[in-house]
A protein has these predicted regions:
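Residue-level marker of alpha-helix boundaries and capping positions
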Residues: 2, 162-163
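Residues that line or immediately flank small-molecule/substrate-binding pockets and catalytic motifs
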Residues: 86, 158, 215
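Short beta-strand segments enriched in small/hydrophobic residues
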Residues: 151-162
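Beta-sheet entry/capping signal
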Residues: 81, 153-154, 210
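Low-complexity, disordered linker/stalk regions enriched in Pro/Thr/Ser/Gly
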Residues: 1-149
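Helical hinge/lid and interdomain linker segments adjacent to catalytic or ligand-binding clefts
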Residues: 164-235
């Protein structure tokens, strides 16, 4: 593989006859090869879409998995390092992963607004462009990412995306307020799609001792039935 920004490759061909005589005027070819920087991007649809969230904000609990694909014209094996950072891209903020890494599950994330940064580097030292989530250059994806705190031991899962005004969630929340008091439970609005990674589904549920999941069967083009997928992630 190319180990510098520009390298020279030498090719030489000699003819040999049946007596073992070697051509003294070998043909030579010198090729200057310029290294290509690697590329990295998030796996298709691995970040939530605004259309599925019915909001421009993605809310998660303190576990979030990011999945990506990397590519190098000189061969993917030349990618030696993947780096990620949270909220700050200072020189010492980056955390290194092996070059063949394709995902990371972050745990115990800071509560509030967060941004995830990602880049990679090849054996010649060339770095990819930095990609991030959220990113305004991808307007179909969520434009804000907020990590919610774990409150109480009860989780209400709102799996009713057609209830845009949240009347059902408000009703169940008022019942929980009456039974257990304010701030004694958490809620999770799924929207039209579960998180891309089943690891995140399991992590969200395992934060709590009791899960109250309400849903409405709809089988329409505008909303999917996500509880089946959630059940599969726990098997």
């Amino acid at each position: 593989p190319i180990r510098s920004s520009l390298d020279l490759f030498f090719f030489e061909v000699k003819a040999v006859d049946d007596q073992g005589n070697i051509d003294s005027t070998a043909s030579k070819l010198i090729l200057p090869i310029k290294n290509s920087a690697p590329e990295i991007q998030f796996r298709y649809r691995s970040n939530p879409l605004i259309a599925n969230l019915n909001s421009d904000t993605s809310y998660t609990f303190p576990t979030r998995t990011f999945i990506w694909d990397s590519y190098d014209q000189d061969g993917n094996e030349t990618i030696t390092d993947v780096f990620y950072a949270l909220n700050d891209t200072c020189d010492t903020c980056w955390i290194r992963l092996d070059g063949n890494a394709m995902s990371i599950t972050l745990k115990e994330l800071d509560i509030g607004l967060n941004t995830f940064f990602l880049k990679c580097k090849d054996i010649a030292g060339a770095s990819s462009l930095t990609t991030k989530f959220p990113d305004s250059s991808r307007p179909s994806e969520a434009q804000h990412w907020i990590v919610k705190p774990i409150m109480g031991e009860i989780l209400i899962v709102d799996d009713y995306p057609l209830d845009n005004s949240n009347n059902v969630l408000s009703w169940y929340s008022s019942m929980m307020d009456t039974l257990y008091g304010d701030h004694s439970y958490s809620y999770w609005e799924i929207g039209d799609e579960l998180p891309y990674s089943a690891t995140d589904v399991s992590a969200n549920l395992n934060y709590f001792k009791n899960v109250f999941w309400f849903a409405a069967y709809n089988n329409t083009a505008s909303a999917s039935d996500t509880y089946n997928g959630a059940e599969a992630s726990l098997v």
